[in-house]
Amino acid sequence: MTTPPANHAALLARRARVLAPTYQLFYEQPLQIVRAEDVWMYDESGRRYLDAYNNVPVVGHCHPQVVEALARQARTVNTHTRYLAEQPLQLAEELLATLPPELGSAIFTCTGSEANDLAVRISKAVTGGSGFIVTEFAYHGATDVIAGMSPEDGNPLGPGVYTVPPPLGAAGDGDFGAQVGACLERMRADGVRLAAMLVDTIFASDGVVPEPRGFLADAVRRVHEAGGLFIADEVQPGFGRLGEAMWGFQRHGVVPDLVTTGKPMGNGHPIAAVAGRAGVFAEFARGRRYFNTYGGNSVSCAAALAVLQVIRAENLLANAQRSGEYLRRGLRELALRHTAIREVRGAGLFIGVELGANSASGLGGAAETRRIVNAMCRRGVLVGSTGRNANVLKIRPPLTLEPQHADLLLDALDQSLQSRV
């Protein structure tokens, strides 16, 4: 293991002194990142790292068009939605143009957590229900209400929150619709009225489950028949990450009642949204209002608008599809040589690599995955981990990733699997 830079001890001491212990750092040897560009992040020594993990900079770190849009608007005016302004209207129009026509309105927030919190509030008001269905290892955000719907973090479930097992994928024998149906029966037996089913459409925290395509449809049908709404959490899979479509729910042939977005929407600038059916919003607005001081502010909207424009202009959905297929093919070739790789799953540039026991390291499951994440970091490639058993490598690079970058990732993973450290 390399020796950490001398200044890290001082930074860690300052951090421990002034930041609450709820904060966590990535990697056994934390990185000090001082600048970034496209798919690269640079530490204080100038060493570069391939960022294959942070799905926030969806069009690449510090994209010049996004930076210029931010700066130009910040030099002009930054205000909120209680004044007439062009920026939130243009952003809403362009965002809604990427969604099914049934989803005709949007509300802006600052984070995906806020967006999910608002979607939950809307669903309660519209349905009169208080029950929610999420998957067993879901993560949907950090507000008090949404933390109670995010069992990944070990949070206790909130009142009226029920869980279902995640879909098992093409290789499994699970029927997600049947699981949701059984959950609805439990809720009825408990006298709980359904408000909504909230799912991340790539099931990222459950281990990345994109297949079989269409498995959500039966579950959504059952939810609607029970009088509930379907909330598609697109904070992680949205904005073209899955390649073939802008949004994860589109791969399943369903139209949500509410769609939430977040992380990549501003390419690092805090902006998020809830899009929904006109009737749902109209019912919510009856006797209620929602205002968020920074949700829909001029500068954030300028950044998000630039992100949408870059995705179109640079044809990033097609690149995510092409580079994602290249990377998954390379990962499956590695699996033929490394028995530690159990399965490669994914769509576009959202990929999960499930790991098991590795004879080279003598480790298995979560311990091996943790070792691989840190070994790849030492080799200049950043990935993360996810899943109920913490044994799935999570790969989410900017949509600008090219095959030559994928080759660097594949080489780092190959070397890490062969090593003992």
Locate the predicted segments by residue:
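Conserved N-terminal phosphate-binding loop of PLP-dependent enzymes in the Aspartate aminotransferase
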Residues: 1-421
